[in-house]
């Protein structure tokens, strides 16, 4: 009692790969990495993708949840060294053509699926319980 638990998970869903890697994003990032994703899309013109993040806070028998999305496309090359995972190949639609890997952390946070999910969760926490 009196302890809160926050869980967050996210994935990259690429249209041209049947929404792969999706729930396997972490595994795919560790195994084939960014160049592997680029190679899989080499002959595929549909590079549209979406990052999705889900956040859940549980405390004293109550829970709040949220989902944040960031639509974009997969780059044809690795660009930038900031961030982690697929950041150097994901270009958000709401940006200026740079990958997340080319952005400062503050720029990425303003656009990212995780930032959106956590902002929505905070808004949900401020709302009265039903």
Predicted segment positions?
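Anionic-ligand binding patches
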Residues: 1-130
